[in-house]
Every structure is written in structure tokens, then in C-alpha cells.
Amino acid sequence: MKPFDFVKPDDQEGVISALAAHSPRVRILAGGTDYLVELKHVSQSPGTIVDVSHLQELRGIEEVEDGLRIGAAVTHTEIMAHPLIEKHVPAMIHAAHTIGAVQTRNLGTLGGNLVTCVPSMDSGPTLVALEAKVTIIGPGGSRCIPLTDFFVGPRKTILEPDELLIDIVIPKCNLGKPTAFHKFGLRKGQALALVNAASSLWVKGGKFKDVKISLGAVAPVVIRCPKAEASLEGLPISQDVIQEAGRIAVTEAKPIGDFRASLEYRNDLIEVLTRRTLNSAIQTANQS
């Protein structure tokens, strides 16, 4: 491991000052489940590491005026056990349960999973399907943007070296919205997704309303499928239209073939998981 400087500020303002002072050779440390592994293999020192794991401003899950706020340093285990998540967005519990092993979920944070920005991340699709927003602070102040705008490419977000992700907010209008997440990997546990998917929707008079479909591991970043969504809007619920939406979703994705799965196999998974998430969300809607 290469030598580096270590800073542990007392608050958010101290973090921003430290990031600005040491930019661009600076990295943020929260759970460290990805970065500490990476750090052992880098060819040069990262410069300065800024520890934010202890900051209470980045913790907590609470209802706010705009919706449900989840601090960026909240762990996956905390998400799985929190009553507000169970009440408003239970699909997040299912997604969090598929992330890594128990130790990874105990240490790894929601913000870290998003910032790492691996296309196969399991936290992304559910949040994208629920139109989540993220809050970023930096020397110039704060900004709130859609999560879909946060992702730029594999392991690349819009965060500047002197900026910090502080929370994720699920809009109030989507709290309690029937949502489902499904993942397919090579193993039942501790597996990267070959494809993962989430769908959210309302059912009004037996018809689809406000459908959102999101896919992971099928493009450089987690994506929405607006054409598949539009194909369902306002239509009576039937397996025929759900199957057609799955076929349309395939055309909106850009999967690759690699040693884990061929392009053709991933296309099949896109269609299947789109159908499964839609049907699961419908089932949730019918039970509510």
C-alpha cells in the first residue's frame, strides 16, 4: 500500500475545506468496502484520504418536507432494518439484501455504492425507478439533482474532487409507490448482477399509471427505459402488454457480452427481469 495523508474533519464544512485544500489528489472514505481493496493495488499514492464515516450529518433516515431523506453514510444493513424504509420503500430492503456479504452490508454505505458507480450496482435501479434525487455540497454551495444525472459512466459521476454527496431523497409523491427489484447473478449470494431491474407503478382502475422501469448492468450506467414505460401508460393490465414492454426494454439497453454472459443471454435477462419486476409491482399494488 502506498503512503498517504489521512484527515478526519469534525463536520461537513471541514470536509469541504479539506477536499478543496488537497484537490485533485484526494479521496473520500466512508465504509471503504471498495476503496480499501483498490488502495492495496494502486500504483501511486492517492495523496490525501478524508474520512467522513463518523459525521452525523451524513447519517440518518427521516421523513422531510420533500420526501424520505437517506444520509449518504447510511449502511445497507441500516436500510434493511429501518421502519421508514419498510413502510415507504420496501423494495430497497430487497435490493440491499443482495449487496455483497453480511460484512459488506454492515460497512458499505448507500452513498459509497452510488459514488463508486459500477454499472451493476444493486442500489441504483430501485432509486432510479423511484426518481430519487441527490444532494451535493462543495465550495460553491449545495445543489440537488436527479440521480440519473449523477451517473456519467462506469466508475464516473459528476462529483468534482472538492464535492461531497450528502444525502439521497425519494420524492414524497413516490413514497408507498408499488415497486419491485429483481437481480440475476451467477450465484444466489455475493454475486455481481448479470442484469438487475426495478419497476415502480400505480394501478388505477385496472390500468397502468406512472410506470418507471430501470435497468442495471446493461449500459455504462443504470438507465431508465422511457419507451417501455410509455408503451404501458394508461393501458389495461395484461401479460401481453407486459411482454411487449420487456421486448421494448431490450431495444433501449446497451449490454455487452463478456466472460460472465453473452450479449444474447443478457438480452434475454432484460426481457425476463422487466416482466418480473412489473408483475411483482402489480402484485404489491393489488395487495395494498
Model-identified regions with their sequence ranges:
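C-terminal structural segment of proteins
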Residues: 1-288
